[in-house]
């Protein structure tokens, strides 16, 4: 109960912080809200399974439903966190595939309940792991791996210097999951997942705050902070200035101009991202 109370306090605080954020898009807020609500809901379901296990058989249905939803929704938390990585409103194909996999997994769990494949609840209302409990473990680790790879790819795309911090987070959540599987009486998984979601929120915000919203390149503030640390005895600074760009805005409008600038930035990133960092300043593009 104490761990669940801590979970709720932290998750409520994060929901308020997400709601008040002026830097997150509506899509990103929605993704974080869904993740926090799922973590809170699964934490409650875990408490319910502990409380009702072994009670009179009239509570058996509640034990089954709580275990089903807890096992079924666990991988969806990672999918929600992947959803917030992309600022675009449309769902990418990979996320749609992940959602379909989650729905298929939920259907499989539902169909397998009478056979006790992943878990079973006896007529005496006693929970036990099924012979194919490993399916849940595979889905859970698969979801974590999906989140990890998506975050690493996004951080590399955005040239985030802190992307190495992703690996300790991955190691942390995997170690606690192994401990939970080996020692099921501990019930520490969702407290650790709550902590992970907070750290992930901080990491993502730091990554996005370094970006220029229009071009996806590192922004001017990031450039100024970085140049203060550089020793000017090595390296090359390449500056790109788009000729007559004002005419594009004047003749075709600022919307078309922004699209042009974003396209140019994408070309520069493809050409130079492997060799150095790309920035967008107010007046020019810099590699």
Question: Where are these predicted regions, by residue range?
Answer:
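Extracellular-loop-to-transmembrane junctions of the mid-late helices
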Residues: 1-7, 111-146, 180-186
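Hydrophobic alpha-helical transmembrane segments of multi-pass membrane proteins
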Residues: 3-59, 63-81, 99-116, 166-181
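Alpha-helical transmembrane segments in multipass membrane proteins, preferentially the mid-helix core
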Residues: 13-18, 80-84, 137-158
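Membrane-interface helix-boundary motifs at transmembrane edges
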Residues: 19-32, 86-96, 152-163
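Non-cytosolic membrane-interface motifs at loop->transmembrane helix junctions
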Residues: 58-68, 123-133, 189-192
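Signal-transducing coiled-coil linker helices
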Residues: 150-152, 156-214, 221-235
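Hydrophobic/aromatic micro-motifs used in signal-transmission helices and low-complexity FG repeats
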Residues: 214-215, 242-244, 252
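Conserved long alpha-helical elements within nucleotide-processing catalytic cores of c-di-GMP signaling
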Residues: 220-236, 246-269, 273, 279-284
